[in-house]
A protein has these predicted regions:
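N-terminal glycine-/serine-/threonine-rich beta1-alpha1-beta2 phosphate-ribose binding loop
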Residues: 1-79
Length: 79
């Protein structure tokens, strides 16, 4: 199955909603691809690490530009 790798910038209210929605989407919608919570950015590396663990992202960063420049990220969701 094809993968769509998600990069999420920001974990405030909308970022939290989007992270939960990406994780639950396969239980609600028939998808042709697996959504992978790949990369999360927050204002500091410490907060990014905490939120990545909380939401199940594979990687984290304190600089949103890392996500935008990463060729392994298919979707950048700016929250």
């Amino acid at each position: 199955m094809k993968q769509v790798r998600i990069g999420l910038v920001g974990t405030g209210y909308i970022g939290r909603c989007h992270a939960i929605a990406y994780a639950q989407a396969p239980t609600v919608f028939p998808l042709d691809a697996e959504l992978v919570l790949e990369y999360l950015a927050e204002i500091t590396p410490e907060l990014a690490e905490k939120k990545a663990k909380e939401f199940g992202f594979n990687r984290f960063t304190g600089d949103w530009r890392d996500i935008v420049q990463d060729p392994n990220v298919d979707v950048v969701d700016i929250c």
